Amino acid sequence: MNVDHEVNLLVEEIRRLGSKGNDGKLSVKFGVLFSDDKCANLFEALVGTLKAAKKRKIVTYQGELLLQGVHDNVDIVLLQD
């Protein structure tokens, strides 16, 4: 799978699992993404896909590296519709 394809899949999963905030942008907690069965099957390296999406300014989140458990409550915010 190529990175662009995985980023597009990530956007679809954020739309499926996320909710709109006060700013009108969709977001989902990292822990929700990480523990979702469909996401677990789709992404071999969820953190790497998130990092690639952040670099392309498709999503944003606090920090550089997200770890299961430690960062479960970090919001992953979708910047593009």
UniProtKB/Swiss-Prot annotation:
SMART domains: Costars. Coiled coil: none annotated. It comes from the Eukaryota. Gene3D superfamilies: Costar domain (1.10.10.1540). InterPro entries: Costars, Costars_dom, Costars_sf. Belongs to the costars family. This is Costars family protein ABRACL. It comes from Xenopus tropicalis (Western clawed frog).
